[in-house]
Amino acid sequence: MKTGLPTTVIGSFPKPDYLPIRDWFDSARDTGEMDSPEATRSYSAYRPSDADEALFVRAAEDIIALQIAAGIDVPTDGEVRRENYIHYHCRHVSGFDFDHLEHRVLRDGAYAADLPAIRQAIRHENAPYSPHDFTASQAVSPRPIKFTLPGPMTIMDTTADCFYHDKRRLAADLGDSVNREIRALVDAGCRHIQVDEPLFARQLDDAFAFGMDGLERCFHKVPSGAVSYTHLTLPTILLV
């Protein structure tokens, strides 16, 4: 019997109105821009409660059900806990400053934003956050879910480096921080893990110079049995 290719989604979904946080990009679009320092500062001040946890689980369950109803084989939790799919990871790693934002032009000039700054060496000194997020969402899914994480190059392009000034070394440290989460996910039972690196398609020279090494570092010593995904996006204009 022939079977089709398994289907999945990139990861994020619009946040339900009942959630206690807003999406970084949605907040920015309210002003017709792509920058929302208010959303960053609001999330920094946010302190989740037990009632909020129930809402995040409810949102994950609703979004997973939508995907399964649409025929998706490997759903995600919609990244419902994240105010920004990149910055959420950074908040769990030391070295990032979310109090004093830096203005930067990013995505090859596509837009400007006030971004968290790297002011010290990147160190993953706290317990991994991903096992909790994964197990809470997996508990309300009848199918194995996929967990998504930002890749080193994508993190680098959405933060302000005020410390390293060395892309290769920064990518290596960021890759190590993602690797710790991935290995913890596998230990928690996650078998579908995606690293988002849309910047590979925009910055080919950097992708070949150090991006591939950073991505490989993300999956270093990850036990066999886990299915790894890499999310790439094509730029608006392709020059051939």
Residue ranges and their predicted role:
Residues 1-232:
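Domain-level signal for soluble alpha/beta catalytic cores
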Residues 231, 236-240:
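Single conserved hydrophobic/aromatic residue that forms the stacking wall/gate
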